[in-house]
Amino acid sequence: MRITEANPDPDAKAVPAAAAPSTASDAAAAAAATAATAAAAAAATAATAAAAAAATAATAAKAAALTAANAAAAAAATAAAAARG
């Protein structure tokens, strides 16, 4: 007895010719995806740079405040030592 496939797989669906993407549309989609990726990378880089600049500014402000506090403490200690003679 010879077995033949009389009933093809019902889940297999043929792709209509109109749905098949053309080379031009593939290239356009790839270009759009590349542009979107580049834009996202640029935005992430800008956000990272802004965060780094803010952190650097905050660190500089803290360092300046500590330096001023240390200078004031040193001046007070010097004045106290001078007052003691």
UniProtKB/Swiss-Prot annotation:
GO terms for molecular function: antifreeze activity. The keyword Repeat applies. InterPro entries: Antifreeze_1. The keyword Nucleotidyltransferase does not apply. GO terms for cellular component: extracellular region. Disulfide bonds: none annotated. Keywords: Antifreeze protein, Repeat, Secreted, Signal. It is found in: Secreted. It comes from the Eukaryota. Residues 1-21 form the signal peptide. Contributes to protect fish blood from freezing at subzero sea water temperatures. Lowers the blood freezing point. Binds to nascent ice crystals and prevents further growth. Belongs to the type-I AFP family. This is Ice-structuring protein 4. The lineage of its organism: Eukaryota, Metazoa, Chordata, Craniata, Vertebrata.
